[in-house]
Amino acid sequence: VFGNLHVWTADTQKSAERKAWLAQLDEMQALKPAVVVPGHMQAGTAMDASAIAYTRDYLQRFEAAAAKAGNSAELIGAMKQAYPQAGMALSLDIGAKVNKGEMPW
């Protein structure tokens, strides 16, 4: 679970892997947790279920943007436009390159 950062996607290179991640996030959300401590977050991120929703929304947007993008630069641009305040740009850079087949992982 991430909080207001670009989500690390280099380890989930296949759509099926990201779908499994989304399913796990759905299970977590269904528990209606009062407190959620993201494993990676910007300072000041709320420690509640909004971090689950953020991670889920990010992964869905990444999936759609990756399908449309012709290369990592296009994917990075789309995600930065969607999440202009998100930190950890290196995560997006590596994840986009790996998922577009431009960097071995």
Predicted stretch roles:
Residues V1, V7, G39-Q42:
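Active-site metal-binding loops of divalent metal-dependent hydrolases
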Residues G3-W8, D57-Q60:
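Acidic/histidine-rich, surface-exposed loop or edge segments in extracytoplasmic proteins
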Residues W8-Q13, F62-A66:
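Second-shell loop/turn segments in exported
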Residues T12-G39:
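An active-site-proximal "capping" alpha-helix that borders the catalytic cofactor pocket
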Residues Q29-V35, Q42-W105:
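Accessory terminal helices/loops
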